[in-house]
Amino acid sequence: SYLLANKEVDGKTAIRYFTDDGKIKDNVVLADMKLAADIPTDVVLFNIDSKGEMTGKQSKDAIVSVFLKVFNEMQGFCGSMPFLADLERKLSEEGLYDTFQSRFEEASSSPWKEARNEFDFNQDDVVKVLSDMEFMSVEAARNWCEKATEPYAISIERFAQLVKTYIEKKGKNHHVVFLVDEIGQYIGDDSKLML
């Protein structure tokens, strides 16, 4: 993951840990590593069992739900409540996410990213801020808040479209790589979880 993202550690990029000391002797392998490091990439590294919901494995969409959660978290959106992440994504697309966060903190005296996990207790502030920003009417914001606590379903196709849209906005041959640990144990013998 460090190499794909070409992360910097102690002032040195990941690829330099391999090139500076001449650790890689095969020029083809080294060229492939440099190519991978030069491609702008978001790497999402996670243990699926620790990110999955305790009751979520019964659903045939359990795996895509976990991928959505970590994808949302990688962007700084709410991972635990996909409806909130959808709102944050829409606000971000419209250039209003920072404004929303500032106004929410003014209205509630709590930073949005801390308060969003207690969404059930903050709905009035969310409605007020969304309507004051003229992002939604009061009625639409209340309706959205009611739906935001309902079960969330996403298809694999819809998730793939979200990732594709994200990549296209990043441009310049940007990649997103999901590196999943413990997937075999997570699926086990459950045929519903197999793709």
What is each residue range found by the language model?
Residues 34-43, 134-140, 167-177:
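Active-site-adjacent bridging/hinge elements
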Residues 47-53, 142-151, 177-190:
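Glycine- and acidic
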Residues 66, 86, 103, 125, ...:
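Charge-rich, solvent-exposed alpha-helical interaction surfaces
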Residues 108-159:
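Long, low-complexity, polar/charged, intrinsically disordered or flexibly structured peripheral segments
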Residues 153-195:
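Conserved Walker B catalytic segment
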